Amino acid sequence: MTGLAQSTKLEQDKAAIKDMCGCYSITFDYAEFFPRDSNYTLHEPYHAKADAEWIFVEEETDNKLVIQHLLVVNDTVIVKHWRQDWLYENQHLYTYDRDKHWDYTALSTEVVEGQWTQKVFQVDDSPRYEGNGTWVHVDGQHYWESTTDAPLPRREFSQRSDYNVMKRTNRHAITSEGWVHEQDNLKILRSEMGDSVLVEEKGRNVYTRIDDSHCQLAMDWWEEHRDYWALVRAEWDALFAQQEDITITPKIEDKVLWQALFALQNEAGDTAEKVREAIQEVLASYVKQGDNDWRSAVE
């Protein structure tokens, strides 16, 4: 590919990613099918909707886009939702294993040539899943697809104990009305003995663009809380930069990580340095790095 063609393709890719941004109503639909065990009983299909979600570029460099999602609930409450970072020709991945443990993986320049990594983060900016793929622009279609392992989704992690890994094939497709996140998932029970697939699942999340006025409350909320979450991201980035495996302790004193970090929004000191120190203290308590006896952190 010539330099000009490569530059044009890169700009096409970035434009498609930015097309995910805006104010959206969303429908979420999931259904299980093809159980691998005849004794498995299919669970009821899942349906949910969100009246408004504000999605926007929070940071941008030549090869990176940080996109934050904010959920508007009942026109009165804002929920800091998930975040997705897009990195061009990224060579550093955190691959989910199981039991809140992610393995650091280095990729060669040959493997990632022309590819984008989508890094998906939880509401507290902790890792969720990461995958590589190539944006495709053909016949008026614009889409990206990747397969990667992930923790249980939020809709099931407190409801299910019969599987512990979801192998997700994610497909993001830009449409005239917004975008669609299609999923072909495998629900897997993973152990030292290997993987056992319980059932397949189809997911379809449809993002339909609505007027930005429906998301004004989210815009205002972010202006108030942006600086705090920039500090949180910076501390996570410092951990990721060490390029070591990561394990997150599920609970400390009956409090999960997101509760501890969200509490600091209002309770931390009023200077950036005090806030940063408080964030560092929380992360040091919950996050274990390296592979030395990491399973003890999740018992």
Task: Cite the ranges covered by each PLM segment.
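Hydrophobic/aromatic beta-strand elements that line small-molecule binding cavities or substrate pockets
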Residues: 42-44, 48-58, 68-70, 83-85, ...
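Extracellular-facing segments of soluble proteins and assemblies that are Gly/Ser/Thr-biased and enriched
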Residues: 71-130
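Short hydrophobic/aromatic-rich beta-strand segments that constitute the beta-sheet cores
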Residues: 26-28, 66-69, 95, 118-123, ...
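Gly/Pro-enriched, hydrophobic low-complexity segments
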Residues: 170-180, 185-203
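Short helix-loop boundary/capping segments
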Residues: 113-167, 186-189
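A short, structured loop/turn motif at beta-sheet edges
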Residues: 18-22, 56-63, 171-179, 209-214
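Tryptophan-anchored aromatic micro-motifs
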Residues: 19-32
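Amphipathic/hydrophobic helical signal segments and adjacent flexible N-terminal regions
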Residues: 4-16, 31-45, 60-73, 93, ...
